[in-house]
Amino acid sequence: MKKGQLFIGALTCLVASMSWGAMFPVADHALEFVDPFYFSFIRYGVVTIMLVILLLVREGKKSFHLEGKAKWIILFGVMAFTIYNVLIFLGQRLMGKSGIMTASIAEALMPMLSIVILWGYKHVKPKKYTMISILIAFLGASMVITKGNISFFFSLGDHLFSILFIFIGVLGWVVYTMGGQIFREWSTLRYSTLTCLFGTAITGIMTAILTAQGYVSVPSIKVIAAIKYDFLFMITLPGIIALLSWNYGIKILSSINGILFINFVPITTLLIMVIKGYNITAFDIVGTLFVIIGLILNNIYQRKEDYKQVLQKEKTNLTIT
């Protein structure tokens, strides 16, 4: 793989991760006015319309053919745009202000979950350096959020269902990220659009049923107007831009390497909290360094392995000739 491609892949994953890190503080304000179901449906309803128009213009009607992969498109769409987007914000809302950082640090679990899934389902044993890098990055993220206070984890028992919702949501996004590898022959735009279309449609159906049962209510125009800037941000940067950037980056780097960048989600959330008056501690600084070191180590070892493969191919070609 060319260095330029690796850089672009890393940059797009970083943009997506930092965008998602910024979304939790913004969502905290929006969720005071609207429930997670309508919040997710309205947000990705607009994103879906934008993606459909963009795909139609760039690739034409033929790109909407599912090519016998409907079940996978629906599965991954539900995982990302129903399970992840609804449950992670539901958990955040139920936890209150503490949900901002809890939902954010939960994202740092994604690399570990992806490795477990690959190891258990596909029997793909990760490289030793990848596992070490992930552990270092996760340790750093944990230090940033907990400030070294172990009791933080024990106090989470008071919010068992909230944590469970967030965890299931995160697991949904891991499955979606890994699912992109099945559609490598498709463009990033096509995979993003079709999964978003079906996932959001199912979220809409579920929201309509809950509304009919009286569990949630349709937000008024006045409510939407009160959080219009929240929606504008959520639809653009953590929405369509982050979605396309993430899927493109994962396509280049692979899910197991690209998902390491998700550790920048809690770091970004923390930086925003700092802007709001949060005091920086030694754990914040050391934890941030751990995350960066974890990413750099993985990148260095990956480059060495790629270089060895290139040398091996050259030796093989010389032997044949």
UniProtKB/Swiss-Prot annotation:
Localization annotation: Cell membrane
Cross-referenced InterPro entries: AA-Vitamin_Transporters, EamA_dom
One Pfam family linked to the record: EamA
Gene Ontology cellular-component terms listed: plasma membrane
Keyword field: Cell membrane, Membrane, Repeat, Transmembrane, Transmembrane helix, Transport
Record-annotated membrane-spanning stretches: 6-26, 37-57, 72-92, 100-120, 134-154, 160-180, 196-216, 223-243, 255-275, 277-297
Membrane topology: Multi-pass membrane protein
EamA domain location: 18-146, 175-300
Broad class of where this protein is predominantly found: membrane
Family: Belongs to the EamA transporter family.
PANTHER family, per database record: INNER MEMBRANE TRANSPORTER (PTHR32322), S-ADENOSYLMETHIONINE_S-ADENOSYLHOMOCYSTEINE TRANSPORTER (PTHR32322:SF18)
Protein name in the entry: Uncharacterized transporter YrdR
